[in-house]
C-alpha cells in the first residue's frame, strides 16, 4: 500500500500510535508487518525506491514462509514510502537499517547516519525512537545525545532483533523481547509497544545492556561453530572423520553442545564479533576469544579453496559448480550477503584463474547469484554437467536431497564432489570411477558407507 492511502495528517494524528519503520530489509519489514497485524498503523520507509515500489505492488522477495500471507491477510496493512513522513504523522520510529562492517572491521555507519540525519528533520519532543539494528555497545546512547542536541527531549530505547533469517516473522512473535531505555519512561513505552506482539518482555537496566545481549547471543554461536570448524580442520590434517568424532562424543553424553561443522556466513554472524569488539575498545577490553572464533570461521572458505585447487590444479579449464549460494539453507533464505559461496568463488578464482564457475540455488535470485561471479543455472543438473568440481555449499533440503550418484554420471573426468556440510557423507563409496568424494572434516576420504 502506498502512503497516499493514509489520508490527511489530521486523521493520522487521531490514531493512538503511528509507527514508522525505517529500513525494510529482513529485519524491518517483518516487524512492520507484525505491528500492522496487531492493529497499529505502520509506515514502512526505505531509501531503495525499487524495493518500495515492489512492496507497494505486492512483490516480496524475502524468503519467509509466513510473511507474504501475513501482508495480504492483515486488515490494516502497512503503507510503504521512500521518504520519511511529515513531522507529526508518526510518534514512534524504529531504526532497522543495515549496519555492516567496513574493510577495517569497524561499523560502516553510513546507513545509520543517513537515517538519523533524516529523522532529525521529522522528530518532535516526546517522540520515541527504537534502535532495532545491531550496533556496538554505546551507539544508541550516542545517537540519543545527538538527537537531543538537535531536537530536544526524545525518548530512546534499544530493542534488538534476535530472530533467525528465514523465519523472522514467526520468531518476533514468540521470542522474548529485550528492552532497554535511556530513561524509565522510554523503556516503559517501548515495552508497552512490543507487548502488543504477545511476547515476554525482558526489561534490562539500560540501552547498553540491550546492545550487549544481542551481540553476545551471536558471538556465542560464532564461538561454538568455530570450535566445531577447528576440529574439522584438525580432522582434515590427521586423517579423521569429524562427523564420526563429534557424533561419537555426543552419543549419550549430556554435556555435549557442539554443533556440526560447516560454513558460518550471512550478514549477522560475520560482523557481530567485530561490532562487539568495537564497543568494548573504549573500555580497554579486547574480546580475544570472539575475534579468534571469527578468524577460524572466516578461514573455512580458504581451507576449502586450497584443498579444491590442489585437486583441480592439473586441469586446463576446470568447471566448478557451486550448489547452494545463499548463506544457509535451513531455514531457507534467499540472502547471499556474506555467504561462503561468494567468498569461495573469490578465493578459488584467485587460485584457479582459468576456471569457469557455475552457480545454482533453489531460492536465491539469479541476478544475486550472478553478482557473486557465477554463471547462474536454473537447475542443479544444468550446473553440474561436465563439471570437474561440485561444491555443496549450503544445507538447503533441495541440496542435501540431490541424487549424487545420478549427478556424478554427468560430470567431467576427473571430478570431485566437495561437501562442506556433511550432507552427502558416505556417498563417495558408491560413485563411479573417476569421481572423488571429499568432505570438510573428512579430506582423508569416505570413512563409512552408511549414507546413500
Residue ranges: model-predicted function:
Residues 2-452:
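Structural/interface elements that position substrates and couple domains in central-metabolism enzymes
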Amino acid at each position: 500500500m502506498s502512503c497516499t492511502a493514509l489520508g490527511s495528517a489530521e486523521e493520522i494524528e487521531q490514531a493512538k500510535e503511528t509507527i514508522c519503520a525505517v529500513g525494510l530489509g529482513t529485519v524491518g519489514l517483518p516487524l512492520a508487518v507484525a505491528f500492522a497485524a496487531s492493529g497499529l498503523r505502520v509506515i514502512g520507509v526505505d531509501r531503495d525506491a525499487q524495493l518500495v515500489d515492489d512492496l507497494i505492488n505486492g512483490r516480496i522477495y524475502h524468503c519467509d514462509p509466513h510473511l507474504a500471507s501475513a501482508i495480504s491477510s492483515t486488515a490494516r496493512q502497512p503503507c510503504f514510502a521512500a521518504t520519511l513522513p511529515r513531522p507529526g504523522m508518526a510518534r514512534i520510529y524504529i531504526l532497522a537499517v543495515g549496519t555492516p562492517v567496513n574493510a577495517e572491521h569497524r561499523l560502516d555507519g553510513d546507513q545509520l547516519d543517513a537515517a538519523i540525519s533524516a529523522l532529525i528533520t521529522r522528530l518532535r519532543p516526546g517522540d520515541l525512537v527504537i534502535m532495532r539494528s545491531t550496533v556496538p555497545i554505546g551507539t544508541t546512547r550516542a545517537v540519543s545525545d545527538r538527537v537531543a542536541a538537535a531536537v530536544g527531549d526524545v525518548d530512546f530505547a534499544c530493542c534488538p532483533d534476535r530472530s533467525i533469517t528465514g523465519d523472522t516473522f514467526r520468531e518476533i512473535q514468540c521470542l522474548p523481547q529485550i528492552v532497554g531505555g535511556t530513561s524509565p519512561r522510554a523503556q516503559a513505552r517501548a515495552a508497552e509497544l512490543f507487548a502488543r506482539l504477545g511476547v515476554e518482555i525482558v526489561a534490562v537496566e539500560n540501552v547498553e545492556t540491550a546492545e550487549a545481549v544481542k551481540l553476545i547471543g551471536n558471538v556465542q554461536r560464532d564461538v561454538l561453530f568455530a570450535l566445531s570448524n577447528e576440529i574439522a580442520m584438525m580432522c582434515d590434517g590427521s586423517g579423521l572423520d569429524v562427523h564420526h568424532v563429534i557424533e561419537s562424543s555426543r552419543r549419550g553424553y549430556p554435556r555435549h553442545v557442539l554443533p556440526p561443522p560447516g560454513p558460518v556466513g550471512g550478514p549477522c554472524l560475520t560482523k557481530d564479533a567485530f561490532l562487539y569488539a568495537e564497543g568494548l575498545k573504549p573500555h580497554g577490553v579486547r574480546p580475544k576469544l570472539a575475534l579468534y572464533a571469527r578468524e577460524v570461521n572466516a578461514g573455512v572458505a580458504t581451507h576449502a579453496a586450497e584443498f579444491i585447487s590442489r585437486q583441480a590444479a592439473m586441469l586446463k579449464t576446470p568447471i566448478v559448480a557451486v550448489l547452494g549460494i545463499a548463506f544457509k539453507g535451513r531455514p531457507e533464505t534467499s540472502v547471499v550477503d556474506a555467504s561462503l559461496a561468494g567468498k569461495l568463488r573469490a578465493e578459488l578464482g584467485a587460485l584457479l584463474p582459468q576456471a569457469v564457475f557455475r552457480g545454482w540455488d533453489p531460492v536465491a535470485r539469479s541476478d544475486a547469484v550472478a553478482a557473486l561471479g557465477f554463471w547462474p543455472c536454473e537447475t542443479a543438473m544444468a550446473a553440474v554437467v561436465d563439471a570437474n568440481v561440485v561444491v555443496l555449499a549450503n544445507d538447503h533440503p533441495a541440496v542435501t536431497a540431490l541424487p549424487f550418484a545420478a549427478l556424478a554420471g554427468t560430470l567431467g573426468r576427473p571430478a570431485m564432489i566437495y561437501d562442506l556440510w556433511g550432507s552427502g557423507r558416505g556417498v563417495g563409496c558408491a560413485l563411479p570411477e573417476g569421481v572423488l568424494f571429499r568432505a570438510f572434516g573428512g579430506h582423508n576420504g569416505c570413512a563409512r558407507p552408511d549414507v546413500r
